[in-house]
């Protein structure tokens, strides 16, 4: 390190390069740039030059910059002036010391002080310490005057400690810059410990004042103003603490009064919210003796903060307070960190909260609800609901769903009122939609349902009206599906519904959808009133719709219309020409006789009913029929009841929804809209809806999807509940119970009397263990719907004088559904009785096979006791059950472990022969005991 550059040497001396180059030129060393190298001789020349120029006493230049700040505290202007700072410029001796240190590399390059410089520094430090001690003494006096005599010892001891500390601080290092922030607690404590040691000066010197009298006066004035400001702040703080203490007392008194009033009102005590404790009220109210050590520590902290803490706010010092903080009563929390951000409270904020009554919410709880939604309804945090559920033994998360009963219990536990919410009823939604859309009601065509007994000519009558041959397309000539048609007549439009039976009609009536306005009751003139006809009359009367009787097949020679009128009169269907209200029309579907008169009678009934429906409104209707087409997907026949159905509408039908992609009428023609009472085929639903489902047009897909998914969940829950008993895990539980087995039967007969008699006879066969469950009974052939019902329920089908069509037989063969045909009712009863007998649990009986006498007992180690026996009666078999009888008392019942004769294992031993045997798990046998051998035989039971 003998050769260094000018730039490096300037950095070591902490001098600008230009100044150093100038001084080198003045010393006779020619250097032009900072990159030129300096030798040891060059440095010595520079040192000699500076020593000659400045002398040994030069080197300290005081640069002071005063800054005055004016602050306003509660209307009082306080002027504070910041002290200047001293910048030390190294002298020639210090430069020489730095050069020497660079050569030896024994210590970092630091300007060394000579003895004379050290004396000067100590004198300056002593003067500053004395001035600071004076300021502290004045501040302590002012503080003592305000707070009383309790702070006098605490103010005197820190002053003495500070006076002792000053020489040591001056001896160890020069005055520190003002930028340093407040030191940590442990550093202050360490400084205090060092202050207790007596400081010995290095050399005796007379301290000389380094500041002028004017500057000293300014410093004294500044210290006095700071002490006055601090005393004023402390007085304000004390006053605020007293006010806060009074508020605390008032709050506690108000809480006690509110608590007493609540107890008197409710009769039970609720735990009140604990009030927050005041943090700064205790020192202002209580006059406790001050600990001298604590007072000394606090005063030392205040002294350290006096010069530096005043600017701590602007410099991010931790723990510093400014005047605004003191004005707010000290309620400003300082968050640790680099920037020292502060979380400010409002100036008038306090811990007092007025007692309020607990808010009780009325919570509507749906069938399922998540924990988060339940907490939101009660206006509590989700953690509280999770805690309540955990106390009930349920480990749940905030996103987990709980059932309605559990949610109601949680609501009650948390002090609120829980009520089960009404289900998302589609009917209610329809009502809201109807109220929202008010459209003018216009006349609509009547909807007519054709009912009657099988083969009485319902479909043939509709064929003639429609001028089509629909019957030829049906398998076996029997109507299997519901058909919907509308016919235009000179007097208006009529919509017809053709049904194979009464089931679909009954389902419509049960749901309250008024799909039918008028019923045409078709009765064959040559057959008379049949049970199905009577049932149709009952359904029409239950629905409250008028009846028009069409007496068909009057073209036959055996036709007797008058007999039909007489028979119907017995069922309260009285012709209008006999003084009743029912129109009777004699027609012939084959020849078309009086068809126009029948349509005229239907339109006359429609005029009396004054049928109207809104047209300019969202459509709603009922699903008449639905199927899954291979090429087109879900196809549904919809009967529009209100409004106008348009292509592109969003339709909801049961659990199915979708945008209508195509609309086709009954003739196969594509249409774009359909008004009230018009049946159409629609395409575009997401799934096949059930027949009889209500359909409605919604505004958007979101609402339709929401309701459809809700219904799917409801139907799924119902389905799972029904299947619960048949699950594998519950099967053994059901076996343990004495539940009766069920034999499910579907009965289809030619006439109502036949299936009623057959159903009644089968139900009489029911016993305690086996019951007959007639799932469905009806008149007509076996259809695909019957086979599907049998597949779903595990039933078999009885056909009494009827047969299944080709499609039904094929479906039954593929799904292994048993179909039995009978012509005699007793054969059907006997077969069902035999099937029920097979379902009965067999009866177990004991059959004694032989008797054995024990004549000798042989004990064999590690084997047990072996009985030497004689078969006295019957046969003893190896797998026989035995009873050990001693003195005519049964001692043990069990099985044989082994059966031998002459050391050979045998399967049986007959009477009169000897044998040896062992009992399984039993050795307590004696000579003279009797063994009774028996077998358990299962005997089939009969009804």
Curated annotation (Swiss-Prot):
It comes from the Bacteria. It is found in: Cytoplasm. GTP binds at residues 452-459, 498-502, 552-555. Residues 452-459 are annotated as: G1. Residues 498-501 are annotated as: G3. Residues 588-590 are annotated as: G5. GO terms for molecular function: GTP binding; GTPase activity; translation initiation factor activity. Keywords: Cytoplasm, GTP-binding, Initiation factor, Nucleotide-binding, Protein biosynthesis. InterPro entries: DNA-bd_dom_put_sf, EF-G-like_DII, IF2_II, IF2_N, P-loop_NTPase, Small_GTP-bd, T_Tr_GTP-bd_dom, TF_IF2_bacterial-like. Residues 99-354 are annotated as: Disordered. Residues 117-141, 173-197, 216-250, 295-308, 319-335 have a biased composition (Basic and acidic residues). GO terms for cellular component: cytosol. Residues 552-555 are annotated as: G4. Residues 443-612 form the tr-type G domain. Pfam families: EF-G_D2, GTP_EFTU, IF-2, IF2_N. Its main location: cytoplasm. Residues 477-481 are annotated as: G2. NCBIfam families: IF-2, small_GTP. Belongs to the TRAFAC class translation factor GTPase superfamily. Classic translation factor GTPase family. IF-2 subfamily. HAMAP family: IF_2_B. One of the essential components for the initiation of protein synthesis. Protects formylmethionyl-tRNA from spontaneous hydrolysis and promotes its binding to the 30S ribosomal subunits. Also involved in the hydrolysis of GTP during the formation of the 70S ribosomal complex. This is Translation initiation factor IF-2.
